[in-house]
């Protein structure tokens, strides 16, 4: 009798463990599937070389986001960061070391405005429920409908979402979904990139 009970408990625990592993694998697959590979994105920033930047501000306060882009000026990469704090100020971070400038910041997602690099790049920040996120700054629906790569998203009044000036769709920065202005069930959410950050003074990586 004792052996029978033991066997049942063992089988129950085994099945429970296998179910847990299966759920983890499914979640992992979902996370991987959500990463956009349509446009190349590779961003690497050494926070320890630039303490106190708005890049880290965005990753250490829930509901704080920043628009990130880059341009090479006089042989050095300049990183541009504009927080959603309502001040409408863009911080310029000059990468002054050879090690930093060895990296290539040409590919930061879909944006490709040669006149104003600050309209390109991605948006990153810390959500309330899903940790750090990085979204492409271009409207995915206008990219598909009209072609080209110049449909930059801008902050809305509450600065927890962004709006496309062309189609007027509004996207949540918490989830990347459309909250207003949707046209059909086939509307696309924001394109998402993988983000890695271990805390203040550590490297920031965004890419696909």
Residue ranges of predicted features:
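Bacterial N-terminal signal peptides that target proteins for export
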Residues: 2-18
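C-terminal motif of bacterial Sec signal peptides marking the signal peptidase cleavage site
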Residues: 25-28
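Bacterial signal peptide processing site
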Residues: 30-33
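Predominantly extracytoplasmic/ectodomain segments of secreted and cell-surface proteins
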Residues: 35-37, 75
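First exposed extracellular module after export/assembly in secreted or surface-exposed proteins
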Residues: 43-208
């Amino acid at each position: 009798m004792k052996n029978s009970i033991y066997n049942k408990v063992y089988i129950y625990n085994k099945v429970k463990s296998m179910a847990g592993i299966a759920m983890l694998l499914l979640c992992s697959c979902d996370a991987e599937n959500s990463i956009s590979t349509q446009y190349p994105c590779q961003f690497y920033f050494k926070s320890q070389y630039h303490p106190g930047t708005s890049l880290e501000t965005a990753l250490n306060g829930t509901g704080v986001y920043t628009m990130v882009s880059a341009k090479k000026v006089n042989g050095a990469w300049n990183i541009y960061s504009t927080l959603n704090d309502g001040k409408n100020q863009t911080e310029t971070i000059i990468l002054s070391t050879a090690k930093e400038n060895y990296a290539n910041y040409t590919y930061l997602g879909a944006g490709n405005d040669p006149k104003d690099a600050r309209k390109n790049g991605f948006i990153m920040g810390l959500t309330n429920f899903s940790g750090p996120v990085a979204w492409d700054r271009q409207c995915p629906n206008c990219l598909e409908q009209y072609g080209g790569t110049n449909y930059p998203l801008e902050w809305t009044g509450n600065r927890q979402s962004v709006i496309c000036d062309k189609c007027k769709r509004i996207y949540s920065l918490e989830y990347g979904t459309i909250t207003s202005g949707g046209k059909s069930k086939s509307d696309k959410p924001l394109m998402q990139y993988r983000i890695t950050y271990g805390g203040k003074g550590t490297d920031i990586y965004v890419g696909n």
